[in-house]
Curated annotation (Swiss-Prot):
Disulfide bonds: none annotated. HIU hydrolysis also occurs spontaneously, but more slowly. GO terms for molecular function: hydroxyisourate hydrolase activity. This is 5-hydroxyisourate hydrolase. One of its GO terms (cellular component) is periplasmic space. Its EC number is 3.5.2.17. It is an enzyme of class 3 (hydrolase). The keyword Disulfide bond does not apply. GO terms for biological process: purine nucleobase metabolic process. CDD domains: TLP_HIUase. It comes from Escherichia coli O157:H7.
Amino acid sequence: MLKRYLVLSVVTAAFSLPSLVYAAQQNILSVHILNQQTGKPAADVTVTLEKKADNGWLQLNTAKTDKDGRIKALWPEQTATTGDYRVVFKTGDYFKKQNLESFFPEIPVEFHINKVNEHYHVPLLLSQYGYSTYRGS
């Protein structure tokens, strides 16, 4: 009986694994914001994803960071395409909620997607009067 259960569990896991891998890889874009002044994640920050178009920027998606300062799946439910994109972090609202001034009402970070089968992570290290970003993993 135990052997049958073990075999059934292994078979079930083997068929489930590709689905889990696909689910983990299907969203190609994530962001993470850390407040450098407090050393803590920046929760509840609105972030917008936009694609460069001939006449400006086309909004694709908007979400808010979770309690860990993350948006794990910012790419909308559509097929990824190569091109120029930007994420816009609405940092002014974040600091305003804390009764703090900020020099940057929003921080746009432009980047290029040249491989749609890769994951793109955009971390933002934030303070009231400065920021830093890079391509994360």
